[in-house]
Amino acid sequence: MSSLSGKVQTVLGLVEPGTLGRTLTHEHLTMTFDCCYYPPPPSHEAISKEPIIMKNLFWIQKNPYSHKENLQLNQETEAIKEELLDFKAKGGGALVENTTTGLSRDVRTLKWLAEETGVHIIAGAGFYVDATHSSETRAKSVEQLTDVLVNEILCGADGTSIKCGVIGEIGCSWPLTDSERKVLQATAHAQTQLGCPVIIHPGRNQSAPFQIIRVLQEAGGDISKTVMSHIDRTILDKKELLEFAQFGCYLEYDLFGTELFHYQFNPDIDMPNDNKRIKRVRLLVDEGYEDRILMAHDIHTKNRLTKYGGHGYSHILTNIVPKMLLRGITEGALDKILIENPKQWLTFK
């Protein structure tokens, strides 16, 4: 049995699972997203280079990945500290920071934010999508990648003694690449060794989550300790959603606050709004999956911070929870989704 068994590992050390409270399971507090810059059309180049100001906020909201400054969340540490203090004041207790290698992970800043705010912060080990993999990462064997993941949890990440408490978000593209497949296999092997929680970023295709689960299963992963992120932009069909739910992984609706007319990364998808997300969560609760649901905002760009007129990290607690109660989701179910399910997932076996 691991020395981590029965505990949750935050950037400040091990804590008892019962101390977490309401938990957002998929957020970012410091990262860069240059890897996913989406060049604007020539007619929009000028506005894409302007500072973030009131008159261009609507354009940035519709084209968040075409504005380079908007992709530098790591420049907003003080603003994010204030947002975390507000999150705590609104009843929040913990947050899983999903920034991995490839997105400028900075565990030192995460530790500082945890110390300054009193919010439990759990850091993520591992690698983002193939486009961010270095030649060194691509050259590693599954066994070597496993060692990297285990080391980031047992010893520390980014050359520090600050330890990660989950593996992920592990980035997957569609179709899955050879390098991503190796990382998934290594993730399953590390999970077997450590009994740790895992969280996956699936490719933008409804078949991607199914393929990923199969790879993890074949490599010996524990699906019951695994989160499939971004369900709200990936599995839109009700029948397919209920079919996927039978695998037993956690189903994460983590784009609350994102209401896009045009989804730049996949124009074929009509991104659901928060009302539709609430309906999907209600469906899953009614179908008996309330112990498999997680929620978050996946804030990863500046425009989603309250400093820039965005919804911020307190949106779910302030706006979504009351609306869910109006739509017939009980307080008991919400406590499961926001407190009990994250606690169970984040606790090492």
Curated annotation (Swiss-Prot):
Its EC number is 3.1.-.-. Its cofactor is a divalent metal cation. Its main location: cytoplasm. InterPro entries: AryldialkylPase_Zn-BS, Metal_Hydrolase, Phosphotriesterase. Transmembrane segments: none annotated. A divalent metal cation 2 binds at E169, H201, H230. Keywords: Cytoplasm, Hydrolase, Metal-binding. This is N-acetyltaurine hydrolase. It comes from Bos taurus (Bovine).
